[in-house]
Amino acid sequence: MMRRSFFLFATALVLAACSTPQPQLGSDGKPLPRLYKIRPGDTGQIQFRMLDSVNSLRQAAGVSPVEFDAALNAAAATHSRDMSVQNRPWHFGSDGSSPIDRIQRVGYGGKLVGENISETYETELETLAAWMDRPDTKRVILAPDATKMGFSWLQEDNGKIWWTLVMGS
């Protein structure tokens, strides 16, 4: 009898571990958003998911795909860190630098097509969807003259993410 009780208890414990937790509900009865936490090993996966998504959107719009550029990635990373320090999403660095200044500093030899930025708790794909909903940021993503892309972010301890996408030619 003791063995059977132990077996039933162990089975129940295993089944309980397999279930997904119920989401917390807000006062409106809808699930509360979950924090999107980026782990250090996620960098490549996130960058290539964004590149693939941008290129899918560009293909649907009839424009050529873009490829990653290490210098533009560096410029995007620098600006994401700087926006976090300033606690302000805007296109100028704390030293007054512009997007053009930043791509020149990292040695990018091409031309700046545009820069999209965001301060959010959303995923990269939710951020891309928000950019596609605005004519000015959509224009940067679908710019026919863009051939290169840089994409980076900084996530603060509280979960806030500072995203930067830079397009060049």
List the predicted regions and their residue ranges:
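Short, surface-exposed glycine/acidic/tryptophan-bearing loops
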Residues: 25-29, 73-122
